[in-house]
Amino acid sequence: MIETREEVGSANFVSLERAIEDLRAGKFVIVVDEASREDEGDLIIAGEKITVEKMTFLLQHTTGVVCAALSQERLLSLDLPPMVKDNRCRFKTPFTVSVDAAHGVTTGVSAADRTKVVQLLADPKSKPEDFISPGHFFPLASSPGGVLKRAGHTESTVDLMELAGLQPCGVLAELVNEDYSMMRLPQILEFARKHNIAVIPVTSIIAHRMLSDRLVSKISSARLPTIYGDFTIHVYESLLEGMQHLALVKGNVAGKSNVLVRVHSECVTGDILGSKRCDCGEQLSSAMSYIAEKGTGVLVYLRGQEGRGIGLGHKVRAYALQDNGYDTVDANLAMGFPVDSREYGIGAQILVDLKLTTIKLITHNPQKYFGLQGFGLSITERVPLPVRISEDNEQYLRTKQERMGHWLDLPCCNNRVQ
C-alpha cells in the first residue's frame, strides 16, 4: 500500500507539460503545495477561459473564497492597492482591495457576477473605472519572481498562465471536503480522479523555472583566507531586490555530488557581535570549520534575513519581549509577524549557479531542509552540528525544538555550558 505523501504524490501527479496543455484548453488543474506550508490544493483555471458553469463548479467544491492571481504591474494599472498596509496573514497572502464589476452585475456574489469580474480582470483592455470596491471578489498580487521568490498558490497560478502563453490572470480557490474541512493530498487525488483533473505540485513549477530562469548574478570573486583556512568568496546580486549575498567555496565543487552545504541567514547580533541569545554565530563558525576540515563544501550567506526575516530592528524588539516572558515564537506573533518568513529561492539559485545538484545540508531547520528541496535541489543527507546550551540560549533553543520542530535533540540541562 502507498502510504507516504511523497509516494502518493509521485504516483498520481502529472507532468507540468500536461497541466499547461489543460490550462490552454480551458480545463482546471490542481496545484498542491508543500506539507510543511499550507498543505492544501487549489483548483485553478485561466481567467480568460472562465465561464459561469466553471465558476459554479469552483464554488461548489471550494471554500467559496474565489480569487484571481495577477501580476503586481497589472494590479497597479487597475489601481487596485493592497487590502491592508500591514499584512499579518501567516503566509503573507497578498490580497488587494476586493472588487466587483462596475456594470452588468447584480449583487456581485452570484456565479455569473463573479465570472464577469474575472473576465474583466483577465482582459488587458480593462481600466480602473471598470471596477468598484469593496466587492465580492479577491484579486491577489503575485510576487515579482513568482514561485522562485514565494512558493505559494498565487505565484504558481500566474507562473502557470505565463508558461501557457495566456493572460497572466488565473482563478484559484482552496478545495474542501463536504464537511468544509480542508482537503489533504489523499482527498485531493480522489477528487481529481473523479473529475479527471490534472494535479501537480508547486515544486514542479519551481524546478522548471530553476532551469529556465536566472534570478541571481555573480558580480565578483576572490580568494579569502580565513581563520578556518582559504576559501573562494563569490558575491551574488539578487535580480529581484538587489540584495547582495555571499558564497564561500572550499575546494572544487562544480559538478560534484553530495557536496557539503550550509545555507546561513544573516544575524548581525550572533555572527558579528557574539550574542548569546541565539546559536547563529556558533552555527556559522562550526559550519565553516567543518567544511574546512572536510576540504570541500559551500557556505551560502543570505543577507536580509535578520531575525528569521523580520529585520534587525524588529528582532531587537523581540528580544525585549523575550525579556518580559515571551518566547521567540510568541514574540514574533505578538508583533504581527510569521514565526519564520524566510524563503530560500535565492540561496538555491546560488547553489545551482555553482553547479550543485545533490547536497549534504548542514541544518537543524526542517523549513530550510524542505524549502531547498522545493527549489529543485536534492538533499541526500542532513548533517547536524553540535548544539551547546547555555543559560542565555536555553529557552530559545528549546522553543525552536518544541514549537518550531527543529531537529536539535537537545541534551538535558546538566550538560549546560558556562
From Swiss-Prot:
Key words, A-Z: GTP-binding, Hydrolase, Lyase, Magnesium, Manganese, Metal-binding, Multifunctional enzyme, Nucleotide-binding, Riboflavin biosynthesis, Zinc
Gene Ontology annotations for the cellular component aspect, listed alphabetically: cytosol
GO BP: riboflavin biosynthetic process
Q: Tell me the residue numbers annotated for binding Mg(2+) 2.
A: 38, 153
Query: So where does GTP get bound?
Result: 262-266, 283, 306-308, 328, 363, 368
Q: Where is this region: DHBP synthase?
A: 1-211
Q: Which cofactor does it need?
A: Mg(2+); Mn(2+); Zn(2+)
Q: Which sites bind D-ribulose 5-phosphate? A: 37-38, 42, 150-154, 174
Highest taxon listed in the record's lineage = Bacteria
Pathway, per UniProt?
Cofactor biosynthesis; riboflavin biosynthesis; 2-hydroxy-3-oxobutyl phosphate from D-ribulose 5-phosphate: step 1/1; Cofactor biosynthesis; riboflavin biosynthesis; 5-amino-6-(D-ribitylamino)uracil from GTP: step 1/4
Q: Which family does it belong to?
A: In the N-terminal section; belongs to the DHBP synthase family.
Q: What does the protein in this record do? A: Catalyzes the conversion of D-ribulose 5-phosphate to formate and 3,4-dihydroxy-2-butanone 4-phosphate. Catalyzes the conversion of GTP to 2,5-diamino-6-ribosylamino-4(3H)-pyrimidinone 5'-phosphate (DARP), formate and pyrophosphate.
Q: What is this protein called?
A: Riboflavin biosynthesis protein RibBA
Q: Origin organism of this chain?
A: Chlamydia pneumoniae (Chlamydophila pneumoniae)
